[in-house]
């Protein structure tokens, strides 16, 4: 599954950067980070991607709670360290937990389109009540806490001003 949209990929290419090769934990590379939209770049920003992805799961609501709680705990650690990139990457993984779980709630196979076409397959009858729908609600709840937190909003605004 391609998480990075072509629009985000184009931004990175215009910068002449291969995000997969940059270590964003190094001070000299931190200014290269771009927030993007939604979950853009979530699988590209190393080492954060590698660390957070190990805890990202949504197969059942129980697993989603454990995953979202762990990612939120990581968010708090990054916040306490003043690491906005880590905070934003946690937000992106929470966003991706929501969107991917919704995809499976809507289409149990994970496939939205009829094979070989752009025809959208019908939604599952239980798309609002399935285990994936509940997992999506869990991730959205935690994502909203992060995205609306005073610290995140302030640090995001500061980061945007320097992009």
Predicted features and spans:
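Intrinsically disordered, low-complexity, charge-dense segments enriched in Lys/Arg
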Residues: 111-163
């Amino acid at each position: 599954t391609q998480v990075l949209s072509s629009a985000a990929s184009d931004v990175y290419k215009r910068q002449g950067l291969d995000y997969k090769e940059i270590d964003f934990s190094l001070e000299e590379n931190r200014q290269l980070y771009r927030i993007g939209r939604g979950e853009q770049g979530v699988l590209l920003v190393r080492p954060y991607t590698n660390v957070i992805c190990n805890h990202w799961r949504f197969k059942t609501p129980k697993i989603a709670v454990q995953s979202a709680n762990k990612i939120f705990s990581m968010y708090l650690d990054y916040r306490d360290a003043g690491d906005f990139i880590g905070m934003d990457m946690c937000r992106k993984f929470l966003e991706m937990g929501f969107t991917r779980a919704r995809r499976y709630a809507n289409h149990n196979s994970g496939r939205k389109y009829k094979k070989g076409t752009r025809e959208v397959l019908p939604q599952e009858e239980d798309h609002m009540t399935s285990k994936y729908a509940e997992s999506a609600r869990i991730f959205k709840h935690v994502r909203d806490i992060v995205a609306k937190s005073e610290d995140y909003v302030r640090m995001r605004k500061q980061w945007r001003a320097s992009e």
